[in-house]
From Swiss-Prot:
Protein name, per record: DNA replication helicase
A cellular-component GO term for this protein: host cell nucleus
EC code: 3.6.4.-
Localization terms from the record: Host nucleus
Keyword annotations: ATP-binding, DNA replication, Helicase, Host nucleus, Hydrolase, Nucleotide-binding
Record carries keyword Hydrolase: yes
Gene3D superfamilies: P-loop containing nucleotide triphosphate hydrolases (3.40.50.300)
Organism of origin: Varicella-zoster virus (strain Oka vaccine) (HHV-3)
Amino acid sequence: MKRSISVDSSSPKNVFNPETPNGFDDSVYLNFTSMHSIQPILSRIRELAAITIPKERVPRLCWFKQLLELQAPPEMQRNELPFSVYLISGNAGSGKSTCIQTLNEAIDCIITGSTRVAAQNVHAKLSTAYASRPINTIFHEFGFRGNHIQAQLGRYAYNWTTTPPSIEDLQKRDIVYYWEVLIDITKRVFQMGDDGRGGTSTFKTLWAIERLLNKPTGSMSGTAFIACGSLPAFTRSNVIVIDEAGLLGRHILTAVVYCWWLLNAIYQSPQYINGRKPVIVCVGSPTQTDSLESHFQHDMQRSHVTPSENILTYIICNQTLRQYTNISHNWAIFINNKRCQEDDFGNLLKTLEYGLPITEAHARLVDTFVVPASYINNPANLPGWTRLYSSHKEVSAYMSKLHAHLKLSKNDHFSVFALPTYTFIRLTAFDEYRKLTGQPGLSVEHWIRANSGRLHNYSQSRDHDMGTVKYETHSNRDLIVARTDITYVLNTLVVVTTRLRKLVIGFSGTFQSFAKVLRDDSFVKARGETSIEYAYRFLSNLIFGGLINFYNFLLNKNLHPDKVSLAYKRLAALTLELLSGTNKTPLHEAAVNGAGAGIDCDGAATSADKAFCFTKAPESKVTASIPEDPDDVIFTALNDEVIDLVYCQYEFSYPKSSNEVHAQFLLMKAIYDGRYAILAELFESSFTTAPFSAYVDNVNFNGSELLIGNVRGGLLSLALQTDTYTLLGYTFAPVPVFVEELTRKKLYRETTEMLYALHVPLMVLQDQHGFVSIVNANVCEFTESIEDAELAMATTVDYGLSSKLAMTIARSQGLSLEKVAICFTADKLRLNSVYVAMSRTVSSRFLKMNLNPLRERYEKSAEISDHILAALRDPNVHVVY
C-alpha cells in the first residue's frame, strides 16, 4: 500500500509559520507510518473530543458523594454519564497498531491496553519510532488496585422496568454490578481531595493565578502536569484509547466513563469546567476475542468461569448503545492482513474472521494441513513447533510426555531439570477463613488444590509438569509451607507470566549479532525506563571484557597463517590509532612488527637473553629465567605471538559524568567496530558467525547451573510478557538488588526469614537479542476477601515462566508464533477459536492440525458476524484496506 505524508489542519501540534500571529501554524505533518485512510479517523476523533455539553448534563460532584452514603446500591439515583465512542476493529495484522501509533503522535490522548500484555505490546510498537512514555492498563488508569482483584462482582443487581432500556439504565446496571470496586475507588478519590493529596488543588491554584494575572481562563492549565507529576492521566485528556478491548467485560466501559467524570470533578480540570466528555476509542476484534468472568464459590471451593459480553460486542449489538454512540459514523474497520503473504491462506483467514460463507475450496485448503493427532502429540516430531490445545489438561499431558521423551533421549542440549516452588500459608488467617466460610473441616491440602489457579498465574498452575505437593508445618512461625517441583527444559523458548525484575549480566551470540546491537542502539532504546548512562556504562564494560574474543578467534588452527599474521598487525595498528595518549613504545613496535621479543605491561621489550618467543613453546632454560613479577608470569604463559594491547595500555574505569560515560562507550565501540571490520574483511562469514560472549564477571555453566563470582556491573531492567526468552538454566548467585526488593515487599516477617533461609534459585534467561539476565523470583501475596474482611492468606514463590512449547489456544491470542501444530477438540469447536489458532502463523507452510474444523460441527458467532457484514456495506462506516 502506498504510504504518504498526511496533513490535517485541526491538529494542535506546532510547525513554525511567520504569517500566523504567534509564529506557529496549527497543522501537523504525520510520519510515514500513517496511511491516507487514517486521516478521517483522526479528524473524527478530534471532532468528538471537541464537543461540549450543556452545564446541566455535566455530572455534579455531589452525585458521586451521595453514592458513598447509600446502604442499598440498587436504590442509587439514575444519572447520565455522557461519553462518546469510536470503534476501531479488524483482523490480525490489518494495521490497527499502526493506527494507534498515529493517534499517539497526532492527538494528545491516553493510550492503554486491556491487559499487561496488550499494554506492553502497544509500548513496543510506539517505541519503534520515538521514546514512549510507559503504557499502563486501563484498569491502572481508572484506579483499580490489587485489593480489588478478589472483589465480589455482581453482588448487587439492578433490573430496569422499561424496554428498551435507556443509557441511564445501562450505566446504572453496570455501576451496581461493579459496585465494590467503584465505591472503593470513589472513597479513595474523595479522601485524596479532602487531604489535598495527589495534586487535587493544582488546577484551583492555577485558576487563582490566572485571575491575579488577568489571563484568560484555562490559559495556564497546560503547565499543571509540569507542576505536579502525580496528576491522574484522565485529567490530562478526554481521549482514551484501549487496545484489545474485546477482552474486557461490558461493565468496564461504564467504569472508565464513571472514573473519568469522578476524577475530573474532584480535580476541577479545564475539560470538566468546559463541559468536554470522554471519548473512548476501543481497538480490537469482536469476533476473535472473548471476555471471561470468574467467580469463586467459597462454600464449594470451586471457580466458576463464565463467558460475558465484551465491550466491542456490547457497543455493536446493543441497540440503545448503537443509537447513543451513533456507531455507524464512529466506526473504522481494517480488513487486510498484511502479515500473511499467501493469497489463498489470507482469504481463508478473512473468511473465518468475518463469518463469510465457507466454500469447498476453503475446506480443501484446510485439508492440506491435517495430520494424525498422534503425529502432533509425539514429541519426537515437529521439533521447534508450538503445540496449541483446547484445554490446560491437554497442555500439561503433552509437557509430561515431552519431558519423559527428553529424559530417555539424554539430549544434553535440551536437558530436563526441576526447581522448587513454595506456598506459605498463614495458620491464623486460614483458621479465620474456615470460620467465615463455615468450613471447620477444610484442610490446607484441599484448599491448595482448589485455589492453585488463584494463587499462581492460571496458565502456569495448569500447564506445567508439576510434581506432588509436600507440606511442612512450622507452628512456631504460624506457617504451613507447601513445596512442589516444576520441570523445565534447557534451551527452550519461554515467556514470563508477569513483569519481573532482571539483572542483565552479559551477552552470548555471534560477533555479527553484537555488532548489530551496537550499530542500531536497540539495547539502549529498549531501556528508556532507566538512565541511558547505565546502559552505556554496561555496554562499555561488556565490550572491554569481550575484546579478547577477537584474539581467541585467531587461535583457530583452520585459519590461513598469512591472514592470521596480517590480522595481528592490523589489530595492533588499530589499537595504536584509537588509544589516545599512547606512544609507539617498544611494546607496540614488537607487536606491529611481529617480533618475538618478550613483552611486559610497562611497555618495554625484555632483553634478548630473557626473551620469550610467542611463536614456539619455551625451552626449560628460558623458563628458568622468568621473572617473579605476577604480571610477567602471566604473559610468559601465553603461547600466541602477540597479546591484546588494550589490556596493557588502557585502564578500564567507571566514569561519573555523562560526557565521560558516553566518551568511554564511543571509544570501546570504535575499537570493537574497527576489529570487526578487519577480521570480517579477512575471514568473512567464518568470523562474523563465530561465537562471541562477554559477561560482567567470569562465568561457567555446570549443566543447568550458572556459576558466577560477582554480578557487580550488571544492568537492572524488566522482563516483559511481550518478549520471548531462551531458558539457559538457573543460578544460586546472590543478587543484592533482589534481596533489597524482597525487603521492600514488607511480607509477613516469618515468611521473609524462611525465604532467606531457603535460598531460592533464580532463572537465567537470554532475550532475542542475545543478552543474558538473571531474573528475580516471582513473589506474590494472596489476600482473600470474605464479605467485609480481608485475610492475608498466603505468599507464593515461583519463577513466573511459561513454556512456548505448548499452550492453550486462548493463551496464544496476541502472540506471533512461527510454527504451529494444533490439536482441536471435535465436540467443542468454535469458529473464533479456530481463527485465533490458525492466525498465529504467517505462513501455511508452518501449520499442522489434527482435523479439519470446517468439515466438523462448529459454533459460529452469528449475531456479531451479521453486524460486521452489515457495517461493511454501510457507507457511513470507514473501511481501511
